[in-house]
Structure formats: structure tokens, C-alpha cells
Curated annotation (Swiss-Prot):
Residues reported to bind ATP: K14, S173, D174, T215, G216, G217, M218, V219, T220, K221
One record GO biological process: L-proline biosynthetic process
Subcellular localization(s) per the UniProt record: Cytoplasm
The protein's name in its UniProt record: Glutamate 5-kinase
Gene name as annotated: proB
The EC number(s) this enzyme carries: 2.7.2.11
Gene3D superfamilies: Acetylglutamate kinase-like, PUA domain
Pathway the protein contributes to: Amino-acid biosynthesis; L-proline biosynthesis; L-glutamate 5-semialdehyde from L-glutamate: step 1/2
Length: 369
């Protein structure tokens, strides 16, 4: 499987704040240069590189006289507005030494959850690669709200990897691999490869890194690996210090094997890029129809409605215990549905007209979770 690492023609690399900054929060020029030298080497081989980089907030701390990452959103956004310019400027200078141009792409959750925005992000990234530029992607921390944000760039990196149909995703942090437990505790050992979820049984995944300047931990990295491998993309998780060795196919870090079956891009987007705007509670018969027989969801099988959504929004379909079993694009507004619950399509068509004969969620717009 390591041969897929060296054979990858398009690579998405994600690096966290703690791997780019000094202990006081400023950008570490040596670390930035080391990363860019590695990625510049890939580009020199004719390989395409997309960099998903945290660090805007961390880079803005020192210039603003802050000694630690702020807890409140307003100060975080102020730091990001200062730090993002410093971060992209430093990258531009470093990549210029390799005769490479960078393009800044700032994304919000809304850009990924709205299908039209998602497709536009794809076109921008695709054109940058066609023009032999290096896209540098980050969450737009300056405008993201507390309620709707990625919070870390691990999930964003996995979504970008699928968006550009990459051959490899590399997650870099301050930890050299996924371990069976806390790396500082006796008895913990690194995990070389993960074939599927069964390989993680009994593994204590946790921790938020060592530096205190980032937001991601091992949990978010494993989740990002799950998302990317589910789309057929191999993932390598290792430290920034081992980036060159990892990209050279050396047996460092943890290699997550991809799923042999890739879902349709639209269903992948629905499952992983969208945020549900509501919940539809299903009776046992509807759960069986949707999950086991992959049927459309009809009003007759819904027992309750939660949330404020409009037709076309993503909603979660939950079982009698409240556990999400599927996600789909709903065909009705939330205010319409309560009067339709428990009624057959023929009854609705007779009472309200043929427009109400449609499914609540069509099977083509539904993905199991």
C-alpha cells in the first residue's frame, strides 16, 4: 500500500498550528521552510499539491501581544484577520524559492454544505492546479460563527481531498503516528496500519496535541481519515518532522487503507459535508424500509418533526431511539410536515392535491449513516 503513496500524482497535505508556530504563537520560519521544501520537491516531480494549513489565529497572537490562544470568538477572529495575511505571505515567499505561485482559498462550513458553493470551490481549486499554482486552503476564521464552523482543519482537509479527487491525504501534526494510548505512557505503541474500524477496537483515541495553540486532536484526525478512506483515498498520519519520509513511502506514521468501494460524489457530500437542519423521527416500519430496503421516506412513516428547514435542506432520519440512520434532502418545508404525518400518499393526493403525492425524502437523495 505504501506504493500508492509514492505513486500519488495529486496530494493533499494538512498541517496543524502546532507544527508551524513557536511556543509563543508566532510563525516558526524554519518549520515553514522545511514543509515548503518538501512540498516543492513534490511539485518538481510533476505532482500536484494542495496544502490545507491551520495557523492564521496562531500567527496573529504575537503581533497582537497575546500569549495564548484566546477563548472568545471575537478575539480569535481578530487574531485570524492579522495572522492570515502573515501566514499566506510567508508561504508565498517560501514557495517562490521553488518558482511556485500560491493561491489562497478561504472556506467556511457554508461553502461546503451548500451544493452550489461546493461545486464552485471545486472549480476554483481545479483551475489553480491547472495553472500549476499551489492552493493553500484554510477555514475563513474571520467570518465563521461559533455555531457553524469546522473548528479544526482535519475535517476540512478530508472534504477538500474528496473534492479535488486526490490520490493521497497526509495529516501532519506534532505526533508521529496514531498510538494505542497516550504516547507518553509506558505500554503505548504506534499503530503502523489501519485497515478498517476493527483495527481501532480498544484503542484509546484522545488528546488535543502538545502545544496548546491548535484546536485539533487525534479524535478529529481519525475522523478525517475515516471520511477520506470512505471515499477511496489512502491517508497517512504522522508528524511534520517526518513529512518528507512519509511522502517518500517510508514506513513512518500510520497508514489508513482506503475503502475498495467509492460512493457517488453527491452522496459523499450529503453524508459528510452537509449539516442537518432538522430531524425526522421514523416509526419501525419506515426505518426498515429506508435502511434495509433503501426505499424513499413517505409521510406515513414519520412520527415527529424537529427543526426549522425548507424544502431542499439536509435532514437526519432517526430511529425510535433518536439515533440517526440516514440523511437526506427533504422535499417539504418544516411547517408543512406536521399535518402530513401518518397519512398515505394516496390520501394526501385526494385531500390536498397531486403535489402532495411526492416523497418526503426520495431514495436518490438519501444516504445511510
Amino acid at each position: 500500500m505504501r506504493d500508492r503513496v509514492t505513486a500519488a500524482r495529486r496530494v493533499v497535505v494538512k498541517i496543524g498550528s502546532s507544527s508551524l508556530t513557536t511556543a509563543t504563537g508566532g510563525l516558526d520560519d524554519g518549520r515553514v521552510d522545511a514543509l515548503v521544501d518538501t512540498l516543492g520537491g513534490l511539485a518538481a516531480q510533476g505532482r500536484e499539491v494542495v496544502l490545507v494549513s491551520s495557523g492564521a489565529i496562531a500567527a496573529g497572537l504575537a503581533p497582537l501581544g497575546l500569549t495564548r490562544r484566546p477563548r472568545d470568538l471575537a478575539t480569535q477572529q481578530a487574531a485570524a484577520s492579522v495572522g492570515q495575511g502573515l501566514l499566506i505571505g510567508r508561504y508565498a515567499a517560501a514557495f517562490a524559492r521553488h518558482h511556485l505561485t500560491v493561491g489562497q482559498v478561504l472556506l467556511t462550513v457554508d461553502d461546503m454544505t451548500r451544493r452550489a458553493h461546493y461545486r464552485n470551490a471545486y472549480r476554483t481549486l481545479r483551475k489553480l492546479l491547472d495553472l500549476r499554482a499551489v492552493p493553500i486552503v484554510n477555514e475563513n476564521d474571520t467570518v465563521a460563527t461559533e455555531e457553524i464552523r469546522f473548528g479544526d482543519n482535519d475535517r476540512l482537509a478530508a472534504l477538500v481531498a474528496a473534492l479535488v479527487d486526490t490520490d493521497l491525504l497526509v495529516l501532519l501534526s506534532d505526533v508521529d503516528a496514531l498510538w494505542t494510548g497516550d504516547p507518553t505512557r509506558p505500554g503505548s505503541t504506534p499503530i503502523a496500519e489501519v485497515h478498517d474500524a476493527r483495527d481501532l477496537s480498544g484503542v484509546a483515541i484522545g488528546g488535543a496535541g502538545r502545544s496548546g495553540v491548535g484546536t485539533g486532536g487525534m479524535v478529529t484526525k481519525v475522523e478525517a481519515a475515516r471520511i477520506a478512506t470512505g471515499f477511496g483515498i489512502p491517508v497517512v498520519l504522522t508528524s511534520a518532522d517526518l513529512a518528507a519520509e512519509a511522502l517518500d513511502g517510508k514506513p513512518v506514521g500510520t497508514l489508513f487503507h482506503p475503502s475498495p468501494r467509492r460512493p457517488a460524489a453527491r452522496l459523499f457530500w450529503l453524508a459528510h459535508a452537509t449539516s442537518p437542519r432538522g430531524r425526522l423521527h421514523l416509526d419501525p416500519g419506515a426505518v426498515e424500509a429506508v435502511v434495509d430496503r433503501r426505499k424513499s421516506l413517505l409521510a406515513a412513516g414519520i412520527s415527529a418533526v424537529q427543526g426549522a428547514f425548507t424544502a431542499g435542506d439536509p435532514v437526519d432520519l432517526v430511529d425510535t431511539e433518536g439515533v440517526p440512520v440516514a440523511r437526506g434532502l427533504v422535499n417539504y418545508d418544516a411547517v408543512e410536515l406536521p399535518g402530513l404525518l401518518g397519512r398515505s400518499t394516496s390520501e394526501l393526493a385526494t385531500a390536498l392535491g397531486p403535489a402532495y403525492e411526492r416523497e418526503v425524502v426520495h431514495c436518490d437523495d438519501l444516504v445511510l449513516l
